[in-house]
A protein has these predicted regions:
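A mobile "lid/hinge" subdomain adjacent to the ATP/sugar-phosphate binding pocket shared
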Residues: 256-301
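Glycine-rich beta-strand-to-loop/alpha-helix junction loops that act as flexible
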Residues: 9, 89-92, 208, 327-335
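Internal helix-turn-beta structural module
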Residues: 297-299, 303-324, 333-396
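Short glycine-rich, Thr/Ser-proximal phosphate-binding strand/loop in the N-terminal lobe
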Residues: 3, 12-56, 228
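Glycine-rich phosphate-binding loop of actin/hexokinase-like ATP-binding domains
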Residues: 150-255
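Catalytic phosphate/nucleotide-handling subdomain of diverse soluble enzymes
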Residues: 218, 224-259, 265, 330-361
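Short beta-strand-loop/turn "lid" adjacent to the catalytic site in phosphate-handling enzymes
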Residues: 70-122, 143, 149-160
Length: 396
């Protein structure tokens, strides 16, 4: 079966065509600057990237270009669209309505629309992708895979905020969590890779990238996660603040003469590693290079990140009453050797010891703790597209 995996953003669209039998990526690509000027970067397996500048006024033109690229003589991986057997869509927010992936129907589309106010930048774009694919490839089954679904197993003590209860009852204000597809994929793989008992396992997944979240997973089910109602909560991220004292918002807003939108822009786009480094960069690689060159602000930003991760890990060990494995994934988690080393340096009380040679590897599935470490620590590359493909195949 060939599955087209679509991740539709507000002005971009990522895709992969995956053979579900072999789990081989047949083709992949990215549409950028949709609604502005438009650019398609596509790559057939085993071939060089092809870049096409073209007008993409809407997502419909972008998706049509993707479908053309999949079937043309130069970049095509299939002879015709009849070889696309199913489409899997990333959907950011399913609220409390979706605890698992679902086959797309009119009723599902309506329910996703009802979650739009929880993800006003992402859900409408996800829905556009679903509708356009339905229009251009009628009859091909579509599946929605939700970022929030994996976290729906959290108990009330983990997802409720210390706010008036009517805000939850009336507006569904609660912790939802994100990166669920990645956390699910990596936690399952950790159990397999590390030889844990799936029915008696406690795993902490550290998904660390430009956006970062940590989750506590007991016997394959999420019991807590760091992101909240929105992806702003939790650890320090590329440009997001993570956890702060909420009263800071009023204090800074008065000092800087900002309204609520202006303050949210600061927290989402000017804070995190970018803010802590004095606006140097939100990219860990830049900060690490600067820190090695003596930039103290960059070094402090990295320290704040590692310290915050270690605190959440410690909290989740308490929440689960123990831990079998701690896993790093995503861009920083898979590649940032210093961050992993700094985080593990705080975990001596757990009997964790780091194999520095193993930790020197980047982007590989590898155990980075020593054989005598009481808790296993590993790096496991995430693959959200493959996870969406698997979810899609399971439902169609």
């Amino acid at each position: 079966m060939n599955v087209l995996v679509i991740n539709c953003g507000s002005s971009s669209l990522k895709y992969q065509l995956i053979n579900s039998d072999t789990e081989e990526v047949l083709a992949k690509g990215l549409c950028e600057r949709i609604g502005i000027d438009g650019r398609l970067v596509c790559q057939k397996a085993g071939c060089d990237k092809e870049i096409t500048e073209a007008s993409m006024p809407t997502h419909k033109e972008a998706i049509q270009m993707v479908l053309d690229a999949l079937t043309n003589d130069k970049t095509g991986a299939i002879a015709s669209l009849k070889e696309v057997n199913a489409i899997g869509h990333r959907v950011v927010h399913g609220g409390e309505k979706f605890a698992s992936s679902v086959v797309i129907t009119d009723e599902v589309i309506q329910a996703v629309e009802e979650c739009n106010d929880l993800a006003p930048l992402h859900n409408p774009a996800n829905l556009i992708g679903i509708r356009v694919c339905g229009e251009l490839m009628p009859g091909v089954p579509q599946v929605g895979v939700f970022d929030t679904a994996f976290h729906q197993t959290m108990p009330a003590k983990a997802y409720l905020y210390g706010l008036p209860l009517e805000y939850y009852k009336n507006y569904k204000v609660r912790r939802y969590g994100f990166h669920g597809t990645s956390h699910s994929f990596v936690s399952k793989r950790a159990v397999e890779f590390l030889g844990l008992n799936p029915e008696d396992s406690k795993v902490i997944v550290c998904h660390l990238g430009n956006g970062s979240s940590i989750s506590a997973v007991v016997n394959g089910k999420c019991v807590d996660t760091t992101m909240g109602l929105t992806p702003l909560e939790g650890v320090v991220m590329g440009t997001r603040s993570g956890n702060i004292d909420p009263a800071i918002m009023e204090f800074i807003a008065k000092k800087e003469n900002l309204d609520i939108s202006g303050m949210m822009n600061v927290l989402n786009k000017k804070s995190g590693l970018f803010g802590l480094s004095g606006g140097l960069s939100s990219d860990f690689r830049d900060l690490n290079e600067a820190a090695e060159g003596g930039n103290q602000d960059a070094a402090n930003a990295i320290d704040v990140l590692a310290y915050g991760i270690a605190k959440f890990v410690g909290g989740y060990v308490a929440a689960m009453n123990g831990v079998d494995a701690i896993v790093f994934t995503a861009g920083i988690g898979e590649n940032a050797i210093p961050v992993r080393e700094k985080v593990v340096s705080y975990l001596g009380y757990l009997g964790v010891t780091l194999d520095k040679d193993a930790n020197g590897h980047r982007g590989e599935e590898i155990v980075i703790s020593t054989p005598d470490s009481k808790v296993k620590v590993a790096v496991i590359p995430t693959n959200e597209e493959l996870a969406i493909c698997r979810e899609t195949v399971a439902l169609v």
